Amino acid sequence: MNDSEIRRQPATVADIVVDTEARGFNMASEPRVGAFLAVLAASKPGGRLLELGTGTGHGAAWLLAGMDPASTLDTVDTDANVVAVAQRHLGSDRRVRFHVMDGAQFLQQTPSNHFDLIYADAWPGKFSHLDDALSLL
């Protein structure tokens, strides 16, 4: 896939990238991953989505771009400093809720069958606590 083919980048992504680079944060999603996230989110109308690893909000911006008005996104990260960037750019969107806490703790305290899609971009849910994450689907 040629990155130049990604023409409809969410408006917030450019500003998030500027803030991300200014902070020296180097773990944001690539544009191709973002475009794929938007497609996945669009496949779940009215969906309840979970992102583990908010970072500066790059992935969340793409998920929100693909979501319909009835969908919701919970996004979790332990680092309040990077989540603040995401909140500044995405916090006015009523569909998103930010959780500054350990992802493993979030997974363990959330009821089973609570989400329709999980994007695990952090240690919990990807490399540890996989069974906890899968139980939420």
Regions found by a protein language model. Name each.
Residues M1-L117, P124-L137:
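A short alpha-helical cap/connector motif
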